[in-house]
Amino acid sequence: MPSVSRIEEQSDSIIHCSFFIFHFIMSIFSKIAAGEIPSYKCGEDAEFYAFLDINPMVKGHTLCIPRREVDYIFDMDDDEIARFQVFAKKVATALKAAFPCVKVGEAVLGLEVPHAHIHLIPMQSEKDMLFSNPKLKLEAAEMQEAADKIFAEFKKL
């Protein structure tokens, strides 16, 4: 039977490992916002960042994130979530100008990446919001062109 100190050591290792994995996963979007991981930037301010989803449902599918690491959107305080929605509205306005559509749909899921984020999706119909649909496969040049169009519109606002 292992000694108490060995069990504590193993527990500490598990906790450390779990924290490292959780922190690493949480940091992916933060690293994108900081420019440590490349992205297709669509808009930004001091608090929030918007970039194209690399597995888009439709062309222009954009993610908005807080720069601050927060897992669950409803863990944000009222003022911060209000500012986040105002930022998302600005990105949606730019998105609609860049990619004319009936409406820009908004979805908050957050099960795959533990960092609060809003999906903004240019919609021609409700089926464009079905996350079970096959994802588009766009070339890097197409992604960059789409991001540039959205960011150009964003800067006008």
Regions found by a protein language model. Give the residues of each.
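Short, basic, low-complexity termini and linkers enriched in Ser/Thr/Gly/Pro
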Residues: M1-I25
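HIT superfamily nucleotide-processing domains
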Residues: F22-L157
